[in-house]
Amino acid sequence: MKAMQVISLTLLCVMAASAQMLRFGKCPKLPVQANFDSSRYVGKWYEIMKLPTQFQKGECGTATYSPKSPGVIGVLNRELLKDGSINFIVGSAKVKHPSEPAKLEVSFTDIPSPPGPYWVLSSDYETHSLVYGCSDFGLFRLEFAWILSREPTMSEETLQSMQSILSAAGVNPEKMVATNQDETYCAPMNQ
């Protein structure tokens, strides 16, 4: 038990230093998008807001999903870094259980780590998507959340609706940060 406390405390310090959303307690069991249809979900999504993460340090974030095989979606995440370079990572998202197709596990080609949860809580497929992920680490949980749009902007009404869903799930939307999607600033992403 003492070893678990030391590991948990060490993890807490590391994650706090890297701006991860580490919270006390186990991951909640949240409802996901009913009748999720991955064929309608594929395509390009713009990141509007996110919980800060160690692995996303840029702006102009996009996620492009493509069909690979039944239950598997190709993933291409891109972002513009402060130095003007474009950072990207390639992976795949797999449906964890066929009975819950909105619960996917994402793994990336260049990262030797276990797959991470990617749960679609809400999406109309045409304008918005709300994604949540959570992993348990002993006494703590590590949370991720993204508000995505098919366009670089999102209406205030839709944004508030997505934030309300997160709030009802126990995720503080005030901890989220906006992603710069300014057309001029993000122009290098279109080259």
Task: Enumerate the language-model features and the residues they cover.
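A beta-rich soluble binding module of mature secreted/lumenal proteins
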Residues: 2-191
